[in-house]
Amino acid sequence: MTELALILVSTVLVNNFVLVKFLGLCPFMGVSRQLETAMGMALATTFVLTLSAVCSYLAYEYLLAPLGVEYLRTITFIMVIAVVVQFTEMAVRKTSPLLHQVLGIYLPLITTNCAVLGVALLNLQEQNSLLQSAVYGFGAAAGFSLVLVLFAALRERLEVADVPLPFRGASVALVTAGILSMGFMGFAGLVRL
């Protein structure tokens, strides 16, 4: 149980996928202009990333490894992620049309988020069990969501701030992301595995 808590804290704070491993930067910069859209993307990513981490583990352990075709893991994981995203979109559309309308384009965009594939591959590299893979996926998603929502709130504040003209837009956003990353570096000594 302690190991699962360490994995969770490590993936959320210490080894954050966006700020430390630089995975998922595209949605981090692209969807963080408004807090509402960032929250929708964070919710969808959390569900899909956790589920795809578990499904990728199962596909590797019970399909690829027994057949001796481990070299197909990347393409298999991409297909698993695409299937999870499509099933998630169909389930959300069927059960809650309002939520589907709110999430809109964000669900299909998760398929191209490199953090989702990164979690599947890093799970394999770290030789996590099924439960550890689920916690690792959830922690990575929670860390991604935390940083995305924080960054979106900061960007909304920057829109009304008196920023010099040359620094407006992407320039001040990248500087802000760097400062946010330095803030998360303070968690580096928190977990020792």
UniProtKB/Swiss-Prot annotation:
Chain coiled-coil ranges: none
Keyword Glycoprotein in record: no
Membrane topology listed for this record: Multi-pass membrane protein
InterPro entries named among the record's database cross-references: Ion_transpt_RnfA/RsxA (IPR011293), NqrDE/RnfAE (IPR003667), NqrDE/RnfAE_oxidrdctase (IPR050133)
UniProt subcellular location: Cell inner membrane
Enzyme class per UniProt: translocase
Biological processes per GO annotation: electron transport chain
Enzyme Commission code(s) on record: 7.-.-.-
GO cellular component: plasma membrane
Keyword line: Cell inner membrane, Cell membrane, Electron transport, Membrane, Translocase, Transmembrane, Transmembrane helix, Transport
Main location: membrane
Keyword flag Protein biosynthesis: no
Domain of life: Bacteria
Transmembrane segments: 4-24, 38-58, 65-85, 102-122, 134-154, 171-191
Similarity remark: Belongs to the NqrDE/RnfAE family.
NCBIfam families (alphabetical): PRK05151.1 (NF003481), rnfA (TIGR01943)
Function: Part of a membrane-bound complex that couples electron transfer with translocation of ions across the membrane.
UniProt protein name: Ion-translocating oxidoreductase complex subunit A
